[in-house]
């Protein structure tokens, strides 16, 4: 078509996001004489700062998460499986208008380090449960939260990690307002981890994290060893590796923007981000810390920046670890 209109050697502006990359690459290969000029700033701006009507959509998505989370809390007790908890969450949010039943994770083990899809784990006293709700969608707009559930008594180390992560989100939240530096918000969240002796610095470049390579830049090997898992073994399988491969957060940052279904992410809240918050920005802040075969936490809320400060879109379920009595 470009050749037909005499544009095979034209200079052409392109507007899109990362979902357009494969199309642009194909187009460039078919028209090697044409020059394509990036002009996506307007679209990137629209993804970064949301309109009041869009904020309503994100708010609804976050409320669906709260509805699902409350349903998950209601059914969780010793003897219940991860399938049943996941189903309770899914049925509740879908019944109120959620658009997908896949896009979030549940992880249960005695350490608090597991995160994935249900596989048949039976809840037991001492379990730590992570509800990592990375995507619930309303009219194409997504929200994200993370919650922890403790079943009965857990270890002192696990309590320490949960407390530091929870305090981090609450401390960072106080700084949310137009003009606030993203770096400052990130660093405020990691301060309780430093106080707890988990970290020495909030700087991403110095921070250990679960996906980090070896010091020489080579891939980090996952430790191969037998990890007892009665429910996994009841299915004829054996868990023969340790996750995470090393201690730290999943990634060395506090959070990121949320957007339309499909994984839009226009900014990260990290120590190296010197951008400032603007009214209409929507993001999740979730502190994470995992220690192999020991302790883990992933907990956070979804926020929109308002003229006066912020609105916690996921405030309908408390951030603090939900406690289940082991005998119930």
Show where each model-derived region lies.
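Active-site neighborhoods and metal-handling regions in enzymes and metal-associated proteins
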Residues: 1-328
């Amino acid at each position: 078509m470009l050749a037909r209109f005499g544009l095979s050697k034209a200079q052409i502006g392109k507007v899109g996001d990362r979902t357009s990359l494969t199309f642009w690459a194909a187009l460039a290969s078919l028209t090697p004489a044409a020059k394509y000029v990036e002009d996506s700033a307007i679209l990137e701006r629209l993804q970064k700062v949301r309109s009041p009507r869009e904020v309503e959509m994100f708010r609804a998505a976050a409320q669906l998460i709260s509805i699902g989370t409350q349903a998950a809390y209601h059914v969780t007790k010793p003897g219940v499986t991860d399938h049943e908890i996941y189903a309770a969450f899914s049925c509740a949010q879908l019944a109120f208008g959620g658009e997908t039943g896949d896009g979030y994770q549940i992880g249960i083990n005695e350490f608090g380090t597991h995160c994935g899809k249900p596989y048949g784990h039976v809840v037991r006293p001492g379990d730590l449960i992570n509800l990592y709700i990375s995507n619930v969608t309303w009219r194409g707009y997504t929200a994200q939260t993370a919650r922890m559930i403790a079943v009965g008594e857990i270890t002192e180390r696990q309590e320490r990690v949960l407390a530091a992560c929870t305090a981090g989100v609450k401390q960072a939240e106080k700084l949310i307002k137009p003009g606030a530096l993203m770096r400052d918000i990130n660093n405020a969240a990691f301060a309780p981890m430093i106080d707890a002796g988990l970290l020495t610095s909030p700087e991403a470049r110095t921070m250990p994290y679960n996906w980090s390579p070896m010091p020489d830049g080579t891939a980090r090997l996952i430790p191969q060893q037998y990890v007892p898992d009665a429910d996994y073994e009841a299915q004829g399988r054996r868990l023969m590796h340790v996750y995470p491969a090393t201690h730290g957060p999943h990634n060395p940052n506090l959070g990121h923007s949320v957007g339309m279904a499909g994984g839009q992410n226009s900014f990260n809240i990290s120590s190296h981000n010197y951008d400032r918050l603007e009214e209409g920005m929507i993001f999740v802040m979730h502190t994470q810390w995992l220690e192999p075969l020991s302790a883990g936490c992933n907990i956070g809320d979804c926020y929109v920046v308002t003229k006066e400060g912020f609105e916690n879109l996921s405030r309908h379920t408390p951030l603090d670890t939900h406690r289940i009595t082991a005998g119930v």
